[in-house]
């Protein structure tokens, strides 16, 4: 049984710090590289068409989503990468060097997404990938995101979910219970982290309830998009103009 528990956030912080350097390689192996396609789908749904804008990437990890976003836009973008794992942000900062000369700028913010250190109505769009199921109070993080988004701003959430198809459920559960922990142990020497991952997916609310939570936080015109038969889901929503 995993010793990590989202009701004890410091244990989750320790977990992500411990696997940060192996995180990208592990994600690629465990998702069969599908996560890159999913990240791009998320980016396409929230991409701003403004000439200059701000991106708030929550639970940013090593920056995959933020950098995928910036690769898709040519207009200057100020990207704020927020995570409570200092090791994850250090990996993101190192990865950003590969951009070389770019019109974009980056800021790395060590913070809890339930208490964002930004003023009201300062961000144009926000993303959160593979993070919300790890948050102790997910509604609070959504309300904070709503607070800092400008009117008309878009939120996009990408999360690992449970497929609805019964046959897919069987294969999914088998993978999570057997192969996932073994691969996680082999790649990171931290089997506990991937036991936690299995449990967090299994116990998290279904996509429909997550969409309702986004609405409860105040977002409108929400959308829900199933990926790979439901093993991942994108939820989008907009802050009203008034």
UniProtKB/Swiss-Prot annotation:
Identification of the protein by name: Demethylmenaquinone methyltransferase
Q: Which InterPro entries match?
A: SAM-dependent_MTases_sf, UbiE/COQ5_MeTrFase, UbiE/COQ5_MeTrFase_CS
Gene name of this polypeptide: menG
Sequence intervals crossing the membrane? none
- GO: which molecular function terms? demethylmenaquinone methyltransferase activity
Which reaction(s) does the protein catalyse, per the Swiss-Prot or TrEMBL entry? a 2-demethylmenaquinol + S-adenosyl-L-methionine = a menaquinol + S-adenosyl-L-homocysteine + H(+)
Recorded family membership:
Belongs to the class I-like SAM-binding methyltransferase superfamily. MenG/UbiE family.
According to its UniProt entry, one GO biological process term is: menaquinone biosynthetic process
Q: Which residues form a coiled coil?
A: none
Alphabetically ordered keywords of this record: Menaquinone biosynthesis, Methyltransferase, S-adenosyl-L-methionine, Transferase
Q: Which Pfam families does the annotation name?
A: Ubie_methyltran
Class in the EC hierarchy, top level:
transferase
- Main role? Methyltransferase required for the conversion of demethylmenaquinol (DMKH2) to menaquinol (MKH2).
Q: What is its EC number?
A: 2.1.1.163
Q: In which pathway does it act?
A: Quinol/quinone metabolism; menaquinone biosynthesis; menaquinol from 1,4-dihydroxy-2-naphthoate: step 2/2
